[in-house]
Curated annotation (Swiss-Prot):
GO terms for biological process: phospholipid biosynthetic process. Probably interacts with PlsX. SMART domains: G3P_acyltransf. Pathway: Lipid metabolism; phospholipid metabolism. This is Glycerol-3-phosphate acyltransferase. HAMAP family: PlsY. It comes from Anaplasma phagocytophilum (strain HZ).
């Protein structure tokens, strides 16, 4: 049963809302505009109003799944729920529907922590807003927030949960490697 849940988590995470919604509503292929990333920040560059919906749906695809599994006691341990979350994030980053070329996993990663650790969620948003307000770089804000939540996770969770969240965070940070290079070279574009 757990294997089926993991497969479902991956497939749900693989739904490329940024691609689908920009194709349907903006008549554009998100993979061919802006940063070419299949995520909410790039959608913002194409259609500001649509970006909020993409963000919510990318968060929801992991948050609703984990919340439901937890609430209905289908998956009982936090460790197993973290594995489900990790598969959702993997699906978002490497979606089967787009030849394994997806987004960076930040929003889907937020969806993982919403039902599991409210403190991590608060730290994520505070650090993201603080960094963004001072720099206007969405990528740097995400990187700082992921690192901050990793620290909080190690301080508040069991070793296995912290390890699983670290794996998830490393995947997300790895997807930001080009942003990191551009930030170092001072070539990264600000959002606003």
């Amino acid at each position: 049963m757990f294997i089926a849940i993991l497969m479902g988590a991956y497939l749900l995470g693989s739904i490329p809302f940024a691609y689908i919604l920009t194709k349907l509503m903006a008549k554009r292929d998100i993979r061919e505009v802006g940063s070419k990333n299949v995520g909410a920040t790039n959608v913002f560059r194409v259609n500001k109003g649509l970006a909020g919906l993409v963000l919510l749906l990318d968060i929801a695809k992991s948050a609703v799944l984990i919340y439901s599994l937890k609430e209905y006691d289908i998956v009982s341990t936090k460790e197993e729920l973290c594995i489900v979350g990790l598969l959702s994030v993997l699906g978002h980053i490497y979606p089967i529907w787009l030849k394994f070329k997806g987004g960076k996993g930040v929003a889907t990663g937020i969806g993982v922590i919403i039902p599991l650790n409210p403190l991590m969620l608060c730290v994520f948003f505070i650090s993201w807003l603080f960094t963004f307000n001072n720099t206007r770089y969405a990528s740097l804000s995400s990187i700082v927030s992921i690192i901050a939540t990793m620290i909080v996770c190690y301080l508040t969770e069991s070793g296995v949960v912290a390890l699983l969240y670290t794996v998830q965070s490393i995947l997300i940070l790895f997807k930001h490697r080009e942003n990191i290079v551009r930030l170092i070279k001072r070539e990264e574009k600000k959002v606003i």
